[in-house]
Regions:
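Membrane-interfacial helix-loop segments of redox and metal-homeostasis proteins
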Residues: 2-144
Length: 144
């Protein structure tokens, strides 16, 4: 089972990366936010996708959260690939710290989405859920 975990983490990282890139494109209006809002996924929570993407809280120091997510998931994909190539996690402590920091940021953003903005954006919550699963899988994979 442990040899499958890096593959699963890599696949989850790909999904998270695609999700974050999609949200980045919507943030920069390469994808029309109206099109995003009318998608089947965003129509489940009327108005939440637009509210989140257009919110001034959707950035940190001018960098959209989705861009940070894309970079985060790209690093995860690279780490999973290296793990599959060399048979062990490269810098396991640093990787755990990186994942823990990402999880903490995701927990904060989820709290903001649900409790403060009252906008449970399905695309955002998907990235946050993936983050939690990856942390759990990584913790399992580093056990002796």
């Amino acid at each position: 089972m442990k040899h499958l975990i890096p593959i699963i983490i890599g696949l989850l990282a790909l999904v998270g990366f695609a999700d974050s890139v999609y949200l980045t494109l919507a943030h920069f209006r390469v994808i029309d936010p109206i099109t995003l809002e009318s998608s089947g996924v965003c129509s489940l929570t009327v108005g939440s996708c637009m509210k989140v993407i257009l919110s001034p809280k959707a950035t940190v120091a001018g960098i959209p959260h989705a861009v940070l997510g894309a970079a985060y998931f790209a690093v995860l994909l690279g780490a999973a690939t290296i793990r599959m190539m060399i048979g062990r996690w490269f810098a396991p402590f640093e990787m755990f710290a990186f994942l823990l920091a990402g999880f903490a940021f995701s927990a904060y953003l989820t709290q903001e989405l649900v409790l403060r903005m009252h906008a449970p954006c399905p695309f955002c919550l998907t990235a946050h859920a993936i983050n939690a699963f990856v942390l759990a899988l990584y913790a399992i994979s580093i056990q002796p």
